[in-house]
Amino acid sequence: MKSYEVNFDGLVGPTHNYGGLSYGNVASQSNSQQSSNPKEAALQGLAKMKALMEMGFQQGVLAPQERPDVAALRRLGFSGTDAQVIERAAKEAMPLLVASCSASSMWVANAATVSPSADTADGRVHFTAANLNCKYHRSIEHPTTSRVLGAMFANQQHFAHHAALPAVAQFGDEGAANHTRFCREYGDAGVEFFVFGRSAFDTRYPAPQKYPARQTLEASQAVARLHGLRDDGVVYAQQNPAVIDQGVFHNDVIAVGNGEVLFYHEDAFLDTDQMLAELQAKLAKVGGKFQSVCVPRSAVTVDDAVRSYLFNSQLLSRPDGSMLLIVPEECRGNERVWNYLQGLTSSGGLIREVKVFDLKQSMQNGGGPACLRLRVALNETELAAVNPGVIMTAPLYGSLTAWVEKHYRDRLTESDLADPQLLLECRTALDELTQILKLGAVYPFQIN
């Protein structure tokens, strides 16, 4: 049976703004309080989805969340009508209103960790929503994330959904941004690669000094247990704490994997040789030939990697067995990075082509091509069981672009977030979106 890797891209929400909420994310902090363009952001994301679909890749879409999150503000003590809650929050605690308006759910690499059926004990595709407890504005996402994923992957014969891990620092979980999977073919048993920043309970592991390590070893281990993964099918690796302190807040800012290939920076991990040997040995047990492509610091510095998002790219398999790298425009703007990529694609290796996309609106908030997508490996039967409304087609692209043009503002500043009309605009838009994507009632305003 044929199998596919389907990229489900996050649709940018109508409240996309530069709130500077993500400590440790250099782009997010450096662009704080600039005016944003939600319409342009959503259209840029949709253009990437359409392009990949037209290249023959399986492409889906993941709906944004309801923002402002009035229920979250009510839990923090603001009361009255919805409009009064927003007005009070703007007057008394603007940072909380900004957090409740964040469109950060567009970076669906953080939505969940996904294990395909070939890896799991019960032969189903498993999803665990990420608790994202390191940042308040993201910690409020997982209930809606779980409902949306449940509406997309509803068939319990094929799909299993787990609630987010306990929302405490010891089980900080950032989802697929710290997880990748190596395999020969997408339908074959593979090796799941979990990258953590620190251990919550074992003091032998070092930790960063400046920025927080958002993923714990214990969270990764818990997800592997929930998904019923074999010990032989899992590798845990620690991200280098020094690069976390340089702005590498998720592993997908310093490494990307696909198929049998890991593309990574020389400084990405601790105990790299041991990690590579374990990946090679475990992948060999399931018939795979592990390959690594190391980018030396002499060619591309960590700072170059963070500024260009070279590794926050999509590494995609083509029918001829070669690979394509999807990178943001910022890579072309960095001379060292661009020179490295030209050399890489002409060297005769597996990565033979680079395609560049303009994702500036997302990039300025610290999210590149890899942040915007959640990878789900599915066989033909499982793909047929996915809600067809979320699979990208030319008609769906047309419907979604028209929907964005109709509902989204082309400029949003911090002061605009206090406008109660914005809440009404967003709810009207999302109500229509659930009909377009055939999701049913997934948002709090539709349920309560």
From Swiss-Prot:
The entry's keywords: Arginine metabolism, Hydrolase
Annotated binding of substrate, by residue: 19-28, 110, 137-138, 214, 252, 365
Molecular function GO terms recorded: N-succinylarginine dihydrolase activity
Domain of life per record: Bacteria
Pfam family, one: AstB
Pathway: Amino-acid degradation; L-arginine degradation via AST pathway; L-glutamate and succinate from L-arginine: step 2/5
Annotated InterPro entries: AstB_sf, SuccinylArg_d-Hdrlase_AstB
Primary enzyme class: hydrolase
EC number: 3.5.3.23
Biological processes, Gene Ontology terms: arginine catabolic process to glutamate; arginine catabolic process to succinate
Catalytic activity: N(2)-succinyl-L-arginine + 2 H2O + 2 H(+) = N(2)-succinyl-L-ornithine + 2 NH4(+) + CO2
Active-site positions on this chain: 174, 250, 371
Transmembrane segment boundaries: none
PANTHER family: N-SUCCINYLARGININE DIHYDROLASE
Function: Catalyzes the hydrolysis of N(2)-succinylarginine into N(2)-succinylornithine, ammonia and CO(2).
Similarity field: Belongs to the succinylarginine dihydrolase family.
Quaternary context: Homodimer.
Protein name according to UniProt: N-succinylarginine dihydrolase
Source organism: Pseudomonas fluorescens (strain Pf0-1)
